[in-house]
Amino acid sequence: ECATLEDVDYLIDAANHYFPNNMISRDDVISTWAGLRPLIQPEADMGDMAESQVSREHQIHIGEDGLVTIAGGKLTTYRKMAKECVDTAVQILKLMGQLPEDLVSGQTYKNPLPGAIGWPEDDDHEAVAKQISEECECEMSDATRLHLVDTYGMRALELSRICAGDPSALEPIVPGRIEIMAQVDFGVREEFAASVADILVRRTQIFFRDEDQGLTAAHAVADRMAPLLGWSDEDRQRSIEAYEAEVALSRRWREEL
């Protein structure tokens, strides 16, 4: 799936309607993406019903063989969906006698997200950045410290320790941008990044923010990832080419101009 020229123009028109002082044009578009929303087909005939009227709610179905299936829903309700799905599976396993009756239901709503443990109650980002400066001896700029804090919360301390042990980790992923190579290391070691696209699209969002979409950095990122993942030269090249293809797909709408 990829965005079309019609999609791009629709979003530009919507943005300019709500923010008329900005007057965005096609030239301002760096990247695009498209996907399918997993809506549940209404039981009744949709008739003239617009897609926007279809329910975004999720449903859980239990098959005759005990398979628990969840469908529909939204990204913003991911935790609630996961909890309800797991709780349903737990109840089934209890009925089958495979789990103790006193097993409690999920408590994920009480668990802080990664990086939130130890976060100051007054939400003072600069205090955490100062803590990094005091605890880790590395030549890191104030802007980089704040970037790491804004991105990783308290886990920014872990990235600063990577930099303290390896000065090359402070090098920018893309010259002139704020993201650093330590984020590549951290992405592989702690966030299951397994490809150049994982880093540039899904961990740093350079794909969406850099005018070149990080194409010039793809080789350096692959070089950084290769020893961490045990890549061969072929693996490295394959990951670079896959990223280049993803960038090309995000720009395909321009072929319609």
Per-region residue spans from a language model:
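C-terminal accessory subdomains/tails of enzymes that are appended
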Residues: 2-257
